[in-house]
C-alpha cells in the first residue's frame, strides 16, 4: 500500500527468465480478465521503480466513479481480485516519455501531480545512482499526505542527490 488509494504490484517472468530492460518513465500494458464483460481488458501503467531490481513494479490508483460514473474497471480488478502468486499478462516495456540520458549535465525539472508521480520515481532513482550531482528540481502536487504515493522512494532518491531540491504542494 503506497498511499490511501495506490497499491504497488511486483511482477517477474513466470518462465524464470530475466526481467526485460527498460528506461525510467516507460510503461507496460497490463491485461486482466473482466468477468462482467467476459473479455480481457488492457490498461497501461508506468513502471514505477528503476530497472535492476529483478522485478517490474507498477503502482495503481484505485479509480472510484463519481457522479454516477462507474469505478475504474481494471484498477478495481487489480485492487480487489489480484493476489500474490496470480499470473498477470504484461507487455514488454515501451514508451517515449523516458529519461534517456541520465548522465547529462543539463539541469532537469520534473513536475507531477497525483498518480503522475509514477514515471518520476524511477527517473529520480536512476539519477541518484548514475548522476547524483546533477541539478534536479522535483515539483509535486497532491490532495494531502495520505494521497502521496511513493514518498519514501522520492525522499531516498533526493537525499542522495546534493544538488536536488523538491517542492511538495498540498
Regions found by a protein language model. Give the residues of each.
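Active-site catalytic pocket residues across diverse enzymes, especially alpha/beta-hydrolases
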Residues: 127-131, 157-158
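Histidine-anchored nucleotide/phosphate-binding helix
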Residues: 47, 117-129
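A short, basic/flexible loop-to-alpha-helix module at the beginning of a structural domain
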Residues: 92-105
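Ferredoxin-reductase
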Residues: 1-87, 142-144, 155, 169-170
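Conserved beta-strand elements of the Class I
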Residues: 109-111
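Reductase modules of NAD(P)H-dependent flavoproteins
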Residues: 135-170
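Conserved S-adenosyl-L-methionine
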Residues: 105, 129-136
Amino acid at each position: 500500500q503506497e498511499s490511501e488509494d495506490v497499491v504497488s504490484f511486483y511482477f517477474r517472468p513466470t518462465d524464470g527468465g530475466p526481467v526485460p530492460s527498460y528506461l525510467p518513465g516507460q510503461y507496460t500494458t497490463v491485461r486482466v480478465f473482466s468477468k462482467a464483460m467476459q473479455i480481457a481488458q488492457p490498461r497501461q501503467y508506468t513502471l514505477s521503480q528503476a530497472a535492476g531490481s529483478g522485478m517490474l513494479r507498477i503502482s495503481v490508483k484505485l479509480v472510484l466513479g463519481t457522479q454516477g460514473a462507474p469505478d475504474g474497471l481494471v484498477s478495481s480488478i487489480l485492487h480487489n481480485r489480484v493476489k500474490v502468486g496470480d499470473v498477470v499478462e504484461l507487455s514488454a516495456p515501451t514508451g517515449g516519455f523516458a529519461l534517456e540520458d541520465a548522465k547529462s549535465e543539463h539541469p532537469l525539472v520534473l513536475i507531477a501531480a497525483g498518480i503522475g508521480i509514477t514515471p518520476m520515481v524511477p527517473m529520480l532513482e536512476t539519477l541518484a545512482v548514475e548522476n547524483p550531482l546533477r541539478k534536479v528540481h522535483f515539483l509535486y502536487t497532491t490532495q494531502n499526505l495520505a494521497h502521496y504515493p511513493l514518498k519514501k522512494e522520492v525522499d531516498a532518491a533526493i537525499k542522495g542527490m546534493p544538488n536536488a531540491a523538491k517542492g511538495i504542494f498540498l
